[in-house]
Structures are given as structure tokens and as C-alpha cells.
């Protein structure tokens, strides 16, 4: 979410800070979770149900890594994309803020479905994809109708950010689909 906001404001420092603030902590945690889940699956002789839970945790970890890469991609694009209303915090010409907010909620609900075993969270995540698709379609149509020779590079960059946010929502649906 921070990388989306930073890209809409053209704030490269903010975008990169989203990942620098505790990069070592995140890497250490990822390493520990990845290795612990692998060790449990391989060496602990888990029962079928426990093995499935650990396997699902590893799947979520891998999907979260993809989400992190998308966030990095968005942050990297911040310096190359210019939005018309960067000074007005509440103007969002392409719906990126609501897309980011909804996607963040989708990710949270998908992981909650795993943790709580509540399939309602997973189902809600899948339903929220309709909102994301609507926002994406609206932004896509706006970009497509306003592109010209002078702004094609910038509009393509904005479209690329929209694609990354939508892809993050799709990943949350992929996680959620395992728990419906």
C-alpha cells in the first residue's frame, strides 16, 4: 500500500523506504519460516492434517513473496510515472488508492482464512475481486481514451502500476481459493 501511495505522489524516497526500514528483519523472518516449514514437512513425521497445514503455510509464504515483488515493482516505477494531481491527496484520477486499500484487505482476509479456518474470509476475498476488476476496467478505459503521442509512455507506466495492483489482488484470490 505504501508503495502505491508513494508512486502516485512521485515520492521515490517514500517508495524505497517501504522496503528499507526493516529489510534485515523481514529476510531473517522469511528465512526462519521457510526453513521451519520445510523441516517440519520433511523431518517431523507429521500426520496428514498437520502436514497439509504446514504445506499451506509454505504456499502462503511463496505467494507473499510474489506480493512483495509486485510492491517493489510499483515502488521502482515511482520516479518514471507522473500523475496529474500529485499535490491533492484526495484526488485519485485512476482509483489506485481504493484498489490498493481493497487489495490490502483482500490479502489480510486470505491469510485470516488460513489462520482462523474461517472460509467466510476466503469467500469475501473472492467477492472483493469484482470491485478490483471494476476499478481496473474504469481506469483502463480512462487511460485508453486519453492516450496520445505525448503521454503514451507515462500512461503505459500508470497502466503497469494498475496491472501490478490487480495482480496482487489475483494472488490474494489464489491464496483464498485454498480455504473456501
Predicted regions span which residues?
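Cytosolic, long alpha-helical scaffolding segments
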Residues: 1-180
Amino acid at each position: 500500500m505504501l508503495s502505491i501511495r508513494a508512486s502516485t505522489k512521485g515520492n521515490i524516497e517514500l517508495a524505497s523506504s517501504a522496503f528499507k526500514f526493516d529489510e534485515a528483519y523481514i529476510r531473517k523472518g522469511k528465512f526462519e519460516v521457510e526453513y521451519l516449514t520445510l523441516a517440519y514437512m520433511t523431518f517431523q513425521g507429521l500426520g496428514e492434517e498437520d502436514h497439509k497445514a504446514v504445506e499451506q503455510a509454505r504456499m502462503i509464504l511463496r505467494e507473499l513473496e510474489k506480493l512483495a515483488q509486485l510492491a517493489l515493482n510499483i515502488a521502482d516505477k515511482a520516479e518514471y510515472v507522473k500523475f496529474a494531481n500529485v499535490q491533492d491527496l484526495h484526488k485519485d484520477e485512476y482509483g489506485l488508492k481504493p484498489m490498493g486499500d481493497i487489495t490490502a484487505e483482500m490479502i489480510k482476509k486470505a491469510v485470516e482464512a488460513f489462520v482462523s479456518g474461517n472460509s467466510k474470509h476466503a469467500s469475501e476475498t473472492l467477492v472483493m475481486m469484482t470491485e478490483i476488476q471494476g476499478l481496473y476496467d474504469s481506469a483502463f478505459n480512462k487511460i485508453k481514451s486519453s492516450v496520445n503521442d505525448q503521454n503514451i509512455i507515462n500512461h503505459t507506466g500508470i497502466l503497469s502500476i494498475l496491472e501490478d495492483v490487480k495482480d496482487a489482488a489475483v494472488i490474494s484470490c489464489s491464496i483464498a481459493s485454498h480455504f473456501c
